[in-house]
From Swiss-Prot:
Disulfide bonds: none
Gene: pyrD
HAMAP family: DHO_dh_type2
Chloroplast among keywords: no
Name the UniProt record assigns to this protein: Dihydroorotate dehydrogenase (quinone)
Species annotation: Marinobacter nauticus (strain ATCC 700491 / DSM 11845 / VT8) (Marinobacter aquaeolei)
Gene Ontology MF terms: dihydroorotate dehydrogenase (quinone) activity
Pathway entry: Pyrimidine metabolism; UMP biosynthesis via de novo pathway; orotate from (S)-dihydroorotate (quinone route): step 1/1
Length: 340
């Protein structure tokens, strides 16, 4: 069924297809017929970051940037949903076209640029959701905010979403906001992590509950970079790390018509790089800091591979676009076998 729907959607421009698909999900959910086309996975509970997840397969940030579709997506069987990336102020993102399919590689190149409606819009949607599963909210900085002032945007984001999130992700790894990835390294990272923990502590005191904070990193790191990030996360006392975001490498798609398009490459070509980063992080972190693995999950084996590499949870996005909801069940069952 999904294969037929995907073939129809793939006749549309990628961003248009994205919006049509999510709108159709909303309609099906409101009509109460969504479960007719999907099968809920059997429970596979895990406890990570002090949170109980019904299963370890979540939806990665980026699909539902504004939290417009939480209820429909939450009905598909995900163990958790992550919305965003949201910035303090609404921004249009980069000029179109800014998303490109590479079906031969089960991949997508995007240079969206944190297009979103801002914190107020997202929070309104989150407050009115019916979905009561685990919800992560991914926060970023506005494009016009200089890196030296970026901590102000992250503080605003954390403070605003704190009352509504089960966990918060700080995105410092999108390749589509100029200079953003510079925040992953050196004193910039250490200073940002310090500010994040300060804001988290202030919010905990204000709201009387502890909301874990994770940082999302890029796959384009060498061993030295991975060791530095791991040490900085431990030193600051972060609660988790999401590995990884999209890659700027085109090695795996050389010769493709879209090879030279600027932006982040996601999907199957990121699988190997993501696993290497997870392995490197786990070698440094062990079980002291949980890893959420994302990047290149297109079937059960690639999901279980992330767990073998050291991840406690996984997230899907591009694979979900190519495979549909059946990927959720397949990934859950593969991970169940891996951890049993």
């Amino acid at each position: 069924m999904y294969g037929l729907l995907r073939n129809l959607l793939f006749r549309l421009p990628p961003e248009r297809a994205h919006n049509v698909a999510l709108g159709s999900l909303d309609v099906a959910q409101k009509l109460g017929i969504l479960n007719t086309f999907t099968r809920q996975p059997e429970p596979c509970p895990v406890n990570v970051m002090g949170l109980e997840f019904p299963n370890p397969v979540g939806l990665a940030a980026g699909l539902d940037k504004n939290a417009d579709h939480i209820d429909a997506l939450g009905a598909l069987g995900f163990g958790f949903i992550e919305v965003g990336t949201v910035t303090p102020l609404a921004q249009p993102g980069n000029p179109k076209p800014r998303m490109f399919r590479l079906p031969e590689h089960q991949a997508i190149i995007n240079r969206m640029g944190f297009n979103n409606e801002g914190l107020e819009h997202l929070i309104t949607n989150v407050r009115h959701r019916r979905y009561r599963g685990v919800l992560g909210i991914n926060v970023g900085k506005n494009k016009d905010t200089p890196n030296e002032q970026s901590e102000q945007d992250y503080r605003k984001g954390i403070a605003a979403v704190y009352p509504y999130a089960d966990y918060i992700t700080v995105n410092v790894s999108s390749p589509n906001t100029p200079g953003l990835r510079d925040l992953q390294f050196g004193d910039s990272l250490k200073q940002l992590l310090h500010a994040i923990k300060e804001e988290q502590a202030a919010c905990e005191q204000k709201h009387g509950r502890y909301v874990p904070v994770a940082v999302k990193i890029a796959p384009d790191m060498d061993e030295q970079g991975i060791r530095f990030v791991a040490a900085a996360l431990l030193e600051a006392g972060l609660d988790g790390v999401i590995a990884t975001n999209t890659t700027i490498s085109r090695e795996a798609v050389k010769g493709h018509v879209h090879e030279q398009e600027a932006g982040g490459l996601s999907g199957a070509p990121v699988r190997e790089a993501s696993v290497k980063v997870i392995q490197g992080l786990y070698a440094e972190l062990g079980d002291r800091l949980p890893i959420i693995g994302v990047g290149g999950i297109t079937d059960g084996d690639s999901a279980a591979e992330k767990i073998r590499a050291g991840a406690k949870l996984v997230q899907i996005y591009t694979g979900f676009i190519y495979r549909g909801p059946s990927l959720i069940n397949e990934a859950v069952e593969a991970i169940r076998k891996e951890i049993s």
